[in-house]
Amino acid sequence: HLLQFRKMIKKMTGKEPVISYAFYGCYCGSGGRGKPKDATDRCCFVHDCCYEKVTGCKPKWDDYTYSWKNGDIVCGGDDPCKKEICECDRAAAICFRDNLKTYKKRYMAYPDILCSSKSEKC
């Protein structure tokens, strides 16, 4: 669920996700095309690909079960589809944290028109 994903990102990075990631680069937020602008944008590209592989549930809207253990996200629950969504979100939140040093403010609210090169395949 997008609100759960937001909480993961906030706790992992300390950044407000809606401001910092919702419109970052060519792939963060809704849709995506072209080549990812940097490592953070690539996190979003990989997250989009992860969501594409999920079948049987709605990644953006279905709630899943997770907890925090020693600063890490632990996905749980009995529903394999929802657990898969959680794992996609977990991986992206960790990716954002791991790439904070190369995060570039100039890619916030990046115009889609500048993402016109050929899109990569998942």
UniProtKB/Swiss-Prot annotation:
CC cofactor note: Binds 1 Ca(2+) ion per subunit.
Location(s), subcellular: Secreted
Major enzyme class: hydrolase
MF terms (GO), sorted A to Z: calcium ion binding; calcium-dependent phospholipase A2 activity; phospholipid binding; toxin activity
Pfam family, one: Phospholip_A2_1
Domain of life of the native organism: Eukaryota
Intrachain S-S bonds: C26-C115, C28-C44, C43-C95, C49-C122, C50-C88, C57-C81, C75-C86
EC number, as in UniProt: 3.1.1.4
InterPro entries membership: PLipase_A2, PLipase_A2_Asp_AS, PLipase_A2_dom, PLipase_A2_dom_sf, PLipase_A2_His_AS
Binding site for Ca(2+): Y27, G29, G31, D48
Keywords: Calcium, Disulfide bond, Hydrolase, Lipid degradation, Lipid metabolism, Metal-binding, Neurotoxin, Presynaptic neurotoxin, Secreted, Toxin
Cofactor(s) of this protein: Ca(2+)
Catalytic center residues: H47, D89
Expression tissues: Expressed by the venom gland.
Job of this protein: Snake venom phospholipase A2 (PLA2) that inhibits neuromuscular transmission by blocking acetylcholine release from the nerve termini. PLA2 catalyzes the calcium-dependent hydrolysis of the 2-acyl groups in 3-sn-phosphoglycerides.
Subunit structure: Homodimer.
Protein name: Basic phospholipase A2
